[in-house]
Regions:
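Active-site and adjacent substrate-binding regions of carbohydrate-active enzymes
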Residues: 1-186
């Protein structure tokens, strides 16, 4: 048995093991020494889990592990770091991206990306897009992290439908949709 929250081919790392953490830090530092300018940490909110109590996201060791990683790696160089955190809320997101630099530069949160998902359906089977809710969520996050943290603005990634197809009309108004979305993000 081993814990895997995604594919059986993707076992979760045991972040409680100090030798594992050091191996991760050594790998990060190897890349920093070669001039990499930043890192994206996939599902970073899952590293501090408490499996005994079935806490998989935002567990008790999450932020201590990120701070330790940052002090051993990221703080050595002028980098941009972003953590993908599906479980982040505006109230907790500033911990990831606090301007004091103790953790990460910014956070990816996904509240705006799941507004049209339908409970019990596949992630590609979307409901009509709730544009007013979308604007309110964007505003809420921007205001909540203003001068406290850095919320990364994005509209798609490798796990989600492409932005023009998701938020626009890729058949009739592909170019117009792309321009509108680019203007909004900028």
């Amino acid at each position: 048995y081993y814990l895997h929250q995604f594919s059986v081919k993707q076992p979760d790392l045991n972040w409680e093991n100090p030798k594992l953490r050091q191996a991760v830090y050594d790998m990060i530092n190897w890349w920093i020494d070669r001039g990499v300018g930043g890192f994206r940490l996939d599902v970073i909110d899952l590293i501090g889990k408490d499996t005994d109590n079935c806490v998989m996201a935002e567990g008790p060791m999450l932020h201590p592990f990120i701070r330790e990683m940052s002090s051993h790696t990221f703080q050595r160089a002028d980098l941009v770091t972003v953590g993908e955190a599906w479980s982040a809320t505006p109230e907790r997101a500033f911990l990831y991206s606090n301007p004091d630099g103790s953790e990460l530069s910014m956070v990816f949160q996904f509240e705006h990306m799941v507004l049209d998902q339908q409970p019990g359906k596949e992630k590609w089977d979307l409901a009509p897009f709730p544009f007013v809710k979308f604007k309110k969520v964007f505003t809420k996050w921007q205001q909540a992290l203003y001068q406290k943290g850095w919320n990364s603005l994005f509209l798609d990634n490798h796990d989600l439908p492409r932005a023009v197809s998701h938020f626009g009309n890729d058949e009739k108004y592909r170019v117009e949709s792309a321009k509108m979305l680019a203007t909004m993000i900028h």
